[in-house]
């Protein structure tokens, strides 16, 4: 299978313009560094000065699994901040992932949403003062269920 893919990739790049080939190399560089959505990677390549056509060619031919990219991006987000299930989906959609990609990533990320509520509550308490009910309301606004919000607040001593 790898040989077939290599032959197909070679056939694609044989007909590509220099700009398309350069955009494809840059797309691979970016994907080796971090996760992108389909539209996010096109936007990044355009920011780098590639035309829309070159960027689209590169993204169409880079071989990325966009579901896998969404899962990687979800893991990246959860490594530095806390999210509710719906909040994570919303953030991934904001980054350009489809609803299906974002939902699957949230479903498969392995997050304990109660623990995410604990972490998010702590993030808020590190920067501001809240009453118990005020923090529960804030967590619910962030997309946590009532049960998750109450758990998060309780675990933080409120």
Predicted regions span which residues?
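An alpha-helical, amphipathic repeat domain used for nucleic-acid recognition
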Residues: 5-158
């Amino acid at each position: 299978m790898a040989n077939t893919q290599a032959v197909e990739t070679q056939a694609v790049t044989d007909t590509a313009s220099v700009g398309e080939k350069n955009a494809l190399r840059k797309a691979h560089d970016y994907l080796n560094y971090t996760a992108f959505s389909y539209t996010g990677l096109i936007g990044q390549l355009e920011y780098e000065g590639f035309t829309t056509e070159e960027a689209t060619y590169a993204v169409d031919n880079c071989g990325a699994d966009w579901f896998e990219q969404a899962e990687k991006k979800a893991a990246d987000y959860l490594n530095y901040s806390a999210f509710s299930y719906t909040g994570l989906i919303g953030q991934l959609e904001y980054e350009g992932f489809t609803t299906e990609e974002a939902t699957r990533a949230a479903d498969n990320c392995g997050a304990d949403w109660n623990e995410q509520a604990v972490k998010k509550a702590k993030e808020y308490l590190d920067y501001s003062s809240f009453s118990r009910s005020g923090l529960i309301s804030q967590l619910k606004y962030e997309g946590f269920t009532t049960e998750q919000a109450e758990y998060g607040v309780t675990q933080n001593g409120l």
